[in-house]
Regions:
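Residues that mark the start of a beta-strand
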Residues: 8, 36-39, 245-247, 273, ...
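Short, surface-exposed amphipathic charged segments that create phosphate/polyanion-binding patches used
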Residues: 78-79, 185-200, 289-293, 367-369
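C-terminal and late-domain segments of enzyme folds
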Residues: 111, 242-244, 256-268, 273, ...
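A short helix->loop->beta-strand "cap" motif at the edges of active sites that frequently abuts
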Residues: 116, 173, 320-324
Length: 457
């Protein structure tokens, strides 16, 4: 097997909220400004953090998830996505050892699968040498993790930094960065986490973070850590030589922005030409053979989505003509008859799915699931099993008695077993988030269905 050197480092945290995304954005911008081609990755299924990565690095950011993409393919997948970059920075998820059940897709698991060294971010606010005890615990917990050092965050003063550094020296943990507390260094939040970059302009904040990182992180030392990683399998271009055989419309705007770039690339690798359109701003779907509606925040744009009757009619007409339509989460909500917002207001939506979606104050589902098809769908025949992820605040309430449930689902953070999604011969809509890079057969099946429909037009 051919191998190539890919300098890479995981920026992990002790827990959520320690400043991983902020620091990674600063690192990406700083290395980019110094002339490095830097490629970013995010552990887990999160859609929002990679958007900040992209602004900072100037490149698409890719998710690394051992549930959505088979673990044995992750190294090759990673190498392919790293491409020609001379440095890869991987942002962890939650705490270093947190993930799904039995550590599935934890930062530690991904780091070991990729042979990537780890640097731990510690929020040092309101602690001194105790930070060293935390670092020692993380270092000792799993000796197979290549623990290389720490970045100290939210330090209050020179004296505060000195105390923490002295503690790290006692246990032999290198301090690669020491960042001072700065209220300007944060990202806006929403009920799913951070606010997407499609709704905010983080450029000024990233510039502030970049300057802080350049002066407070030893970028040369961090690069040496990344360069210590062993060579990896040579990358593979999955789209090379592929003949385009069908056009698929992809809904993309402020309301629908949750797409894994690798998932879209997987559709292209199967012969799809992707054509982007906006359910918010356009009056009709493009001339295509199939439609994809990703997740996002349609609940924040209900007035505009509801008032764009021309677009809704265009989608309904496509459905009546049996055009293949695939939707995830926010896309499912939009395809329903009505959406009830957080305040109880009701908005008319497309009406392809005979159900209403109701926003709830509490999170309804979160976690990794296995979805087994209860009937033939756009992604495969009855019995096809898919690995996906759910995270939503709304509930779907069918308006017909004989509702054609798409999947039987098992899993979640609180393990459950339930039916979900909607499936007909030409529509598949559910709360399930998939990465087609890990479901290539599903991607092929959908592209095949779109191509077949195109021949009937």
């Amino acid at each position: 097997m051919n191998t190539v050197p890919i300098p890479r480092v995981v920026i992990a945290g002790t827990n959520s909220g320690v400043g991983k995304t902020t620091i990674v954005a600063g690192l990406l911008a700083a290395y980019r400004a110094s002339g490095h081609g830097v490629q970013s990755f995010k552990v887990g299924p999160d859609y929002i953090d990679p958007g900040f990565h992209k602004i900072a690095s100037g490149r698409e950011s890719y998710n690394l998830d051992s549930w959505l993409v088979p673990p044995d393919t992750l190294p090759t997948f990673f190498a392919s996505m790293a491409g020609d970059a001379d440095l890869a920075i991987i942002e962890g998820v939650m705490g270093l050892y947190d993930g799904g059940r039995e550590g599935v897709s934890s930062t530690a698991q991904i780091a070991k699968q990729l042979g990537a060294p780890v640097v731990l971010v510690i929020d040092c606010k309101a602690m001194g040498e105790s930070a060293a005890a935390i670092a020692m615990g993380f270092r000792e917990y799993d000796k197979d993790v290549d623990f290389k050092g720490v970045i100290l965050n939210r330090l209050g003063s020179d004296n505060h930094e000195r105390m923490v550094r002295e503690g790290m020296e006692k246990i032999g943990v290198p301090v690669i960065g020491a960042i001072r507390r700065d209220d300007r260094m944060h990202s806006p939040e929403r009920h799913l986490g951070l606010t997407p970059v499609t709704e905010v302009d983080p450029t000024e904040a990233i510039a502030t973070i970049q300057h802080a990182v350049e002066s407070m992180v030893d970028l040369e030392a961090l690069y040496k850590v990344a360069a210590s990683a062993a060579p990896m399998p040579a990358p593979i271009d999955i789209t090379k030589g592929v003949t385009k055989r069908t056009k698929i419309g992809v809904a993309y705007d402020e309301a629908f922005s949750f797409y894994y770039p690798a998932s879209l690339s997987a559709l292209e690798a199967q012969g799809a030409e992707l054509v982007y359109f906006s359910p918010l701003k356009d009056s009709a779907i493009p001339d295509v053979d199939g439609l994809v509606f990703g997740g996002g925040f349609p609940e924040m744009f209900l007035q505009a989505l509801s008032e764009n009757t021309a677009m809704k009619e265009s989608i309904s007409k496509a459905n009546q003509c049996s055009m293949p339509i695939y939707a995830e989460c926010g896309g499912l909500m939009y395809l329903c008859e009505h959406i009830h917002d957080f305040d109880g207001n009701v908005f008319d939506t497309v009406g392809v799915v005979p159900a209403n979606c109701v926003m709830q104050q509490k999170l309804q589902k979160v976690g990794y699931v296995t979805a087994t098809a209860k009937r033939n769908t756009l992604l495969g025949n009855t019995g096809t099993a898919l690995h996906g992820h759910e995270f939503h605040f709304s509930t779907m309430e069918p308006t017909i008695e004989e509702f054609p449930w798409a999947f039987h689902l098992e899993g979640g953070r609180k393990p459950q077993s339930y039916d979900g999604g909607y499936a007909t011969d030409n529509v598949l809509a559910s709360y399930l988030h998939l990465n087609f890079a890990g479901s290539l057969e599903g991607a092929k099946h959908f592209v095949d269905m779109c191509e077949a429909f195109g021949h009937t037009k």
